[in-house]
């Protein structure tokens, strides 16, 4: 046995009682997903046409697949992220932008329209007279070098995620 882990329980009289054990008989290795440091690295001057036209100087970035399902049903929780973003920055004098690098399933025009419809549905949850911050959809495939430019863009100040239920399911 390479390792033995015992689960102990505190009894009312103060004594400890063993309630289970885990024996690890074979060493395991965990290989975390890596990063290609030749591609993903700091850049001195980063420009990406898709982001350059965004008017805000401060933007949040979210990157993730917008899964199927209704509000609160996708693992990335993009709908809730947008709703919370609107709530936090509605009617503020200076508003940041939110850039969503996302798609639902494909990079098709129909998929893009579906993502825009979802954003609009969330926007419609708020009173019409509210001044809501801008949410930008960056839809489509980007190369690793373009993604690095996106991550390093001077307007992007913060990466945000409400993801839950993540795993290694490939």
What are these regions (language model features)?
Residues 149-167:
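Acidic donor-binding loop of glycosyltransferase active sites
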Residues 29-31, 136, 158-160:
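Hydrophobic/aromatic beta-strand patches that form the interior of the parallel beta-sheet core
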Residues 24-27, 94, 155:
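Short loop/turn motifs at secondary-structure junctions
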Residues 1-28, 37:
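A short, active-site helix/loop in glycosyltransferases that binds the activated sugar's phosphate group
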Residues 37-149, 153:
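Conserved catalytic-core segment of nucleotide-activated headgroup transferases in glycan assembly
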Residues 2-3, 72, 110, 170:
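Short glycine-/acidic-enriched loop or helix-start segments at secondary-structure transitions
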Residues 80, 168-170:
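A short, glycine- and acidic-residue-rich donor-binding loop in the catalytic cores
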């Amino acid at each position: 046995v390479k390792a033995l882990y015992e689960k102990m329980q505190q009894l009312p009289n103060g004594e400890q009682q063993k309630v289970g054990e885990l024996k690890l008989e074979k060493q395991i290795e965990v290989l975390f997903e890596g990063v290609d440091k030749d591609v993903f690295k700091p850049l001195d001057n980063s420009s990406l046409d898709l982001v350059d036209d965004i008017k805000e100087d401060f933007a949040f970035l979210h990157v993730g697949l917008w899964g199927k399902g209704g509000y609160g049903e996708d693992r990335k929780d993009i709908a809730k992220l947008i709703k919370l973003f609107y709530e936090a920055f509605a009617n503020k004098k200076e508003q940041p932008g939110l850039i969503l690098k996302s798609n639902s399933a494909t990079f098709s025009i129909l998929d893009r329209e579906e993502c825009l419809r979802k954003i609009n549905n969330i926007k419609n949850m708020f009173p019409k007279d509210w001044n809501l911050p801008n949410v930008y959809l960056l839809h489509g495939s980007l190369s690793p070098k373009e993604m690095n430019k996106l991550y390093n863009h001077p307007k992007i100040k913060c990466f945000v995620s409400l993801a839950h239920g993540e795993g290694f399911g490939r």
